[in-house]
């Protein structure tokens, strides 16, 4: 299972680190994902959920 938020679709994005001399190296920015048990179709299931979705109340934990 990929590390993508089940509800919001947030996932890893890539970009560059830029030094003072404007050199660039690849970097990744990862979302704060938590493994949470939620009810899906009336059955408990463990899914990756972003902390933002948990805090905003979009997710109901079991």
From Swiss-Prot:
One of its GO terms (molecular function) is structural constituent of ribosome. The keyword Ribosomal protein applies. The gene is rpmB. It comes from the Bacteria. This is Large ribosomal subunit protein bL28. One of its GO terms (biological process) is translation. It holds the Pfam family Ribosomal_L28. GO terms for cellular component: ribonucleoprotein complex; ribosome. Transmembrane segments: none annotated. Belongs to the bacterial ribosomal protein bL28 family. The keyword Ribonucleoprotein applies. Keywords: Ribonucleoprotein, Ribosomal protein. PANTHER family: 50S RIBOSOMAL PROTEIN L28, LARGE RIBOSOMAL SUBUNIT PROTEIN BL28A.
């Amino acid at each position: 299972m990929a590390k993508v938020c089940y509800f919001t679709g947030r996932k890893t994005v890539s970009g560059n680190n830029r030094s003072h001399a404007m050199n660039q190296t690849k970097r990744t920015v990862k979302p704060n994902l938590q493994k949470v048990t939620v009810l899906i179709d009336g059955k408990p299931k463990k899914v990756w959920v972003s902390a933002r979705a948990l805090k905003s109340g979009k997710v109901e934990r079991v």
